[in-house]
């Protein structure tokens, strides 16, 4: 069950400290961190300072964020359950009209001189992914959803050999 007392930066930093001491380090990328934004520059649940703290705490674990939102087919769906009162659907399921996607990417990624540029300018090895998760395809005649098939809309290419470890190493090194 969801426990809002655990959804804090302190809890995240404790988890990162634990994860950072595992024998095999996993990869962690923030999942659509500006989907909760209320305006351009008003980030919502995930603040830039938190992303910096998490990266500082575990730079070999916390590697970046999904900068291209999922649910890219939201504007194409015929499923009325995903539309607002005006009959509109929002790209990437970024539902606040004051904080839309920008060219298919969220504001933390898309704004020149913005957050991602700042992170790179600070010398951080902080990467952007374009996810291809797919829950329900927008053209499904029975259960139309908000998604394209994996890889149908956007992809993250990794310079890697065709093995799991090589792909993970490429993601860690930013060869994407």
Protein language model annotation of sequence segments:
Residues 1-176:
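Extended, charged catalytic domains and RNA/DNA-binding interfaces, predominantly
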């Amino acid at each position: 069950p969801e426990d809002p007392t655990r959804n804090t930066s302190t809890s995240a930093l404790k988890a990162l400290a634990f994860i950072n001491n595992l024998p095999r380090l996993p990869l962690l990328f923030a999942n659509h961190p500006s989907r909760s934004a209320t305006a351009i520059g008003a980030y919502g649940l995930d603040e830039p300072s938190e992303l910096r703290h998490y990266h500082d705490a575990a730079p070999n674990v916390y590697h970046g964020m999904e900068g291209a939102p999922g649910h890219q087919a939201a504007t194409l769906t015929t499923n009325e359950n995903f539309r607002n009162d005006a009959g509109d659907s929002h790209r990437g399921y970024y539902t606040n009209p004051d904080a839309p996607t920008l060219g298919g990417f969220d504001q933390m990624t898309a704004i020149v001189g913005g957050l991602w540029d700042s992170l790179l300018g600070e010398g951080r090895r902080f990467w952007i992914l374009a996810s291809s998760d797919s829950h329900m395809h927008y053209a499904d005649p029975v259960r139309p959803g908000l998604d394209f098939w994996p890889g149908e809309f956007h992809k993250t290419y990794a310079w890697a050999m065709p093995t799991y470890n090589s792909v993970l190493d490429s993601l860690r090194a930013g060869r994407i």
